[in-house]
Amino acid sequence: MANVSMRDMLQAGVHFGHQTRYWNPKMKPFIFGARNKVHIINLEKTVPMFNSALDFLEQKAAKKGKVLFVGTKRAASDAVKEAAISCDQFYVDHRWLGGMLTNWKTVRQSIKRLKDLEVQSQDGTFDKVTKKEALMLARELEKLDKTLGGIKNMGGIPDVIFVIDADHEHIAIKEANNLGIPVISIVDTNSCPDNIDYVVPGNDDAIRAIKLYLEAAATTIKAGREQDVIVQAEQDGFVEEVSE
């Protein structure tokens, strides 16, 4: 599991919340105080809560659980995609379509269309139609890939979602709640911590902070996956005892 210290969090600015006038009173237990009308998050709470979330993530990864990273705002989207790809998981980084989880049957049809178009773009089909038709198909492919490219190989709903900004991604959280999918979320001082299984109080705007959370999550998932490989090898008799 990744080990994130209080110093790491301080350097990344995890402790800086939003302006005091935008606060959500439900975040009061996680707020240390205010400085220059900006709330300061209590990292003595954040560190163990984040470690608890990572521990859960590692357990899920060790059982081949599918993790969906969600972060569609500009500050998070690139880092979300990068982290998910680095640990061979899934992501939504552009826009959350209503029903992305709760209406999976329809989403699956759109994913099939995306994959068909990908094949057609490679096998010369686009060259056999008129320029106008080829352009329309290329645009459709681009649009579908932007929205569904990060989940096209997920093969069903995820086992856990990891969210950057609970307020911005409230629809994703609600859908996960409806399906009983555990939610890990970074929750800033302006957001509501309700209906989140693993609340991580922290700055959800600073790119350095966002990268810190995501890199730690990706490292943890990889560690969990390695555990699964070792256990599997032991069960299959591939691991030999090394005598002294």
Swiss-Prot record:
GO molecular function term, any single one: structural constituent of ribosome
Cross-referenced InterPro entries: Ribosomal_uS2 (IPR001865), Ribosomal_uS2_bac/mit/plastid (IPR005706), Ribosomal_uS2_CS (IPR018130), Ribosomal_uS2_flav_dom_sf (IPR023591)
GO biological process: translation
Coiled-coil features, chain-numbered ranges: none
One GO CC term on file: cytosolic small ribosomal subunit
CDD domains reported for this sequence: RPS2
A Pfam entry, by short name: Ribosomal_S2
Keywords, comma-separated and alphabetical: Ribonucleoprotein, Ribosomal protein
Keyword Ligase listed: no
Family per similarity comment: Belongs to the universal ribosomal protein uS2 family.
Name of the protein in its database record: Small ribosomal subunit protein uS2
Gene: rpsB
